[in-house]
Amino acid sequence: MNEVAVEADRLTKTYSQDGESFNAVDAVSFELPFRGVFGLLGPNGAGKTTTLEMLAGLRPADRGSVRVLGVDPFVDRQTMTRRLSIQPQKAALFQHQTVQELLGMWASFFPHSRAPADVIEELDLSASARTRVAHLSGGQLQRVLVGTAIISRPEILVLDEPSAGLDPNIRDDLWRVIRNEGERGTLVLLSTHSMEEAEELCESVIIMHEGRIVADGTPRDLIIENVPGGDVGFVIDPERFSQSRLRSDILEPELDYSVERLASGLSIFVETSDTDFFLKRLLASEAASSVRHITVGRVGLDHVFRTVTGKELLDD
C-alpha cells in the first residue's frame, strides 16, 4: 500500500507582472503521509497559499506534478470534493444565515458529516450559534471557516493561516481543534508565518522563501541542525514523563538546570558545556516523545529561518 498521501514533484506556478514572469512557486518537491499535522512556514509572498491551492486542485500547476490521494487534484475534482477540505483565508459566506444554519447547510453536502452541534461545541461557538454571519467578530468568523472545513470529516484538511489575527485564548482553542484533527487520523496541512504555531502544532515543517523550499524537517531537528551550540531549553509533558524520572534519567547531578511549570507543560532550561552530548542523551531517552519546543542557546525556529534565508520573519 502506498503510504504517501500527497506527492509534489518540482511543482511550479508562474505569473506575469509588469511584462515580466516570475515563479510564485519554484520547483517545490515534498511528500506527506496519511496522518499528522504538517506546516508550510514563511512570510507573505513565499508561495505558501499558491502551493496549497495547487494541492487542493483550485489552481493548475504550470510545470511539475502533484498527486493527492493518488490522483491529479485539478483533474479529479470529484475525489477532491469528497476527500479533501480547505479553509481559505477569506470566503464568501451567506451573510443572512446563522452559524447553526450555515454549518447545517454545509453538513448536508456530505453523506458522513459530523453533527453541526458537535462542531459548534468543539469550536466554542455555542453562544454564537444563532448569530447571523454578518454580525460575527473576526475571531468567530475564523472559527466558522474552520468549522466548514472539518464538518465533512475529510481525509485531508488544508488550512491557510488558520489562526491569523486571533487573540491568544481563541488561538489556543483553535490549536486544540487542529491537534484533535491530526489525532483522529486526518492529514492536516497548514500555512503559517507564526513560529510559535509551527512549533506548537507541526510534526514537520517546510520553510519556504521566494517560492522555494529552503529547509524542511521536524522543528526539533531544524533547530538542532542550524544552531551551533549553547544551553538547552525544552518543554515536556509531565503526564507522559514525570519530573522525577526526568531528573533521574536525563538531568545529571552536575548539571545546572531550572524548572518552570507552564500551561503547556514543564519548561526546563539546562546549562551545559556539551550541547551535542546532552541533546543526544535527551533524544535517545524514553522522554524524547514527550519533548516539545527545543531551543539551543535560547533560540528556536526564528533563528533557523534567519539562518536559511538571511532574513527576519515577523511573527504574530
Residue spans for each PLM region:
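Residues at or immediately flanking beta-strands
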Residues: 65, 231, 293-295
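Short loop/turn segments at beta->alpha junctions
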Residues: 98, 218, 297-300
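ABC transporter nucleotide-binding domains
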Residues: 4-6, 13-210, 214-215
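ABC-family P-loop ATPase nucleotide-binding domain
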Residues: 1-14, 311-316
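C-terminal coupling/interaction segments
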Residues: 272-316
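Solvent-exposed beta-strand sheet faces enriched in polar/charged residues
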Residues: 9, 235, 260, 295-297
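A generic structural signal for secondary-structure junctions
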Residues: 85, 107, 111, 224-228, ...
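ABC transporter nucleotide-binding domain
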Residues: 176-271
